[in-house]
Amino acid sequence: MVKVGLVDDYRVDLEKLEAIVSRMQDVEIVFSTDSAKEAYRRVKNGDIDLLLADIEMPHMSGYELADLIKSHSLDVDVIFVTGHGGYAVHAFDLNVHDYIMKPYYADRLAASFDRYLKKKTETSLNGRILIKQKSEMHVLQKKDIIFAERTGRSTTIVTTAEEVQTYQTLNDIKGDLPEKDFLRSHRSFIINIHYIKHFSAYTKHSFTVSFEGTSKKAMITKQQLDYFQNYYF
């Protein structure tokens, strides 16, 4: 089921969009609003997978909204549905899924959703990571990794189900993990932001990190904690 948000300051266009999307299979409209600021609040809460947005809106444009989504590494795709063609080149700089011009037909929107669903399926197949050891290999679900710690020449990966040791470095592992979910919190740690429970001061420039799912703790520098607060909230 794809969870969708709709935002357009023009009520007639918003109602048309609602009518078309509500008839699609495996799609749930989570919210429909005329405010880009309200849409951004819902996006930050992790309420949706896909946002359909007009561009020219008061207070915050759809372009500004998509830019915030990208710059904060939020896991939401965007389809622009707009009457203005002049933003197309800049829109794709933001890696939006599609750019649909008004007036449009339902078939055009349905085709865009079909491409999105295909992309989503392909992406889900890439949700695993291969961790190498000297004599064996482990296949882990990325979403199950809580954190990884480098100690000496060994890296320990703590998951919701087990701990795995590997000779692979944090740099090797970080390259295979999505930036929107994993943060290099310290020279010795990579953490999954979705399992964070709280931070405790450790030194003037560092904090310990506690997680859901394990009693083990990681470290985060003050600089990276500031980054976490600014870019993930």
From Swiss-Prot:
<keyword id="KW-0597">Phosphoprotein</keyword>
<dbReference type="GO" id="GO:0000976">
    <property type="term" value="F:transcription cis-regulatory region binding"/>
</dbReference>
<dbReference type="GO" id="GO:0006355">
    <property type="term" value="P:regulation of DNA-templated transcription"/>
</dbReference>
<feature type="domain" description="Response regulatory">
    <location>
        <begin position="3"/>
        <end position="117"/>
    </location>
</feature>
<keyword id="KW-0805">Transcription regulation</keyword>
<dbReference type="Pfam" id="PF04397">
    <property type="entry name" value="LytTR"/>
</dbReference>
<dbReference type="InterPro" id="IPR007492">
    <property type="entry name" value="LytTR_DNA-bd_dom"/>
</dbReference>
<dbReference type="InterPro" id="IPR001789">
    <property type="entry name" value="Sig_transdc_resp-reg_receiver"/>
</dbReference>
<dbReference type="InterPro" id="IPR011006">
    <property type="entry name" value="CheY-like_superfamily"/>
</dbReference>
<comment type="function">
    <text>Member of the two-component regulatory system NatK/NatR that positively regulates the expression of the natAB operon. Acts by binding directly to the promoter of natAB.</text>
</comment>
<dbReference type="Pfam" id="PF00072">
    <property type="entry name" value="Response_reg"/>
</dbReference>
<dbReference type="GO" id="GO:0000156">
    <property type="term" value="F:phosphorelay response regulator activity"/>
</dbReference>
<keyword id="KW-0963">Cytoplasm</keyword>
<keyword id="KW-0238">DNA-binding</keyword>
<dbReference type="GO" id="GO:0032993">
    <property type="term" value="C:protein-DNA complex"/>
</dbReference>
<dbReference type="GO" id="GO:0005829">
    <property type="term" value="C:cytosol"/>
</dbReference>
<protein>
    <recommendedName>
        <fullName>Transcriptional regulatory protein NatR</fullName>
    </recommendedName>
</protein>
<feature type="modified residue" description="4-aspartylphosphate">
    <location>
        <position position="54"/>
    </location>
</feature>
<keyword id="KW-0804">Transcription</keyword>
<dbReference type="InterPro" id="IPR046947">
    <property type="entry name" value="LytR-like"/>
</dbReference>
<keyword id="KW-0902">Two-component regulatory system</keyword>
<feature type="domain" description="HTH LytTR-type">
    <location>
        <begin position="129"/>
        <end position="233"/>
    </location>
</feature>
